[in-house]
Amino acid sequence: GTGG
């Protein structure tokens, strides 16, 4: 997944 991607997070920021």
UniProtKB/Swiss-Prot annotation:
Q: Which UniProt keywords apply?
A: Adaptive immunity, Cell membrane, Immunity, Membrane, Receptor, T cell receptor
Q: Which GO terms describe its cellular component?
A: T cell receptor complex
Q: Which domain of life is it from?
A: Eukaryota
Q: Which residue windows are coiled coil?
A: none
BP-aspect Gene Ontology terms:
adaptive immune response
Cell compartment(s), UniProt: Cell membrane
The task this protein performs is described as: D region of the variable domain of T cell receptor (TR) beta chain that participates in the antigen recognition. Alpha-beta T cell receptors are antigen specific receptors which are essential to the immune response and are present on the cell surface of T lymphocytes. Recognize peptide-major histocompatibility (MH) (pMH) complexes that are displayed by antigen presenting cells (APC), a prerequisite for efficient T cell adaptive immunity against pathogens.
Q: How does it assemble?
A: Alpha-beta TR is a heterodimer composed of an alpha and beta chain; disulfide-linked. The alpha-beta TR is associated with the transmembrane signaling CD3 coreceptor proteins to form the TR-CD3 (TcR or TCR). The assembly of alpha-beta TR heterodimers with CD3 occurs in the endoplasmic reticulum where a single alpha-beta TR heterodimer associates with one CD3D-CD3E heterodimer, one CD3G-CD3E heterodimer and one CD247 homodimer forming a stable octameric structure. CD3D-CD3E and CD3G-CD3E heterodimers preferentially associate with TR alpha and TR beta chains, respectively.
Name it: T cell receptor beta diversity 1
Q: Which organism is it from?
A: Homo sapiens (Human)
